[in-house]
Design a protein with these regions (language model features):
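Amphipathic, Lys/Arg-enriched alpha-helical "gate/interface" segment within cytosolic domains
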Residues: 1-135
Length: 135
């Protein structure tokens, strides 16, 4: 079990990557740690890479993960989930559950596309920026 949290200042983004076997409790603990880094720096971009996990998390584990995102993550946060092709079915479930909870999450098979997507401004962020410019 291991995970790495890499904050990248120029992108205002935190990269969270998992490797090996990861019990659900530790999986969530790593996400909370990454969220804390985002909160401290006032950033809203998170890229989660699970391609190096040795096993595919079960549907209930992924459901718990997505539910946790929905209840604990700021609505302005963008989360890109990078998965392997055999993880895609479960990633689709995570995306659907998170979006029902109004979390901006998308899954990707290509890490470069995930990074491009997460760096885009959301509609809400654009409106906030316009509002600040008018003041």
């Amino acid at each position: 079990m291991s995970y790495f949290i890499n904050p990248v200042g120029e992108d205002r983004c935190v990269f969270l990557s998992y490797e090996g076997e990861m019990p659900a409790v530790e999986f969530s603990a790593a996400r909370y740690e990454a969220d804390a880094v985002l909160d401290r720096r006032h950033w809203n971009r998170l890229v989660v890479d699970v391609t190096q996990l040795q096993s595919v998390p079960t549907a209930p584990e992924l459901f718990d993960f997505a539910s946790g995102l929905s209840s604990n993550i700021s609505r302005t946060r963008r989360v890109a989930l990078v998965v392997r092709p055999e993880q895609e079915r479960h990633a689709r479930l995570v995306q659907e559950v998170a979006r029902r909870g109004r979390v901006s999450l998308m899954y990707f098979l290509d890490p470069d596309q995930a990074i491009l997507w997460v760096k885009q401004s959301s509609g809400r962020q654009i409106m906030e920026r316009i509002g600040k410019e008018k003041l």
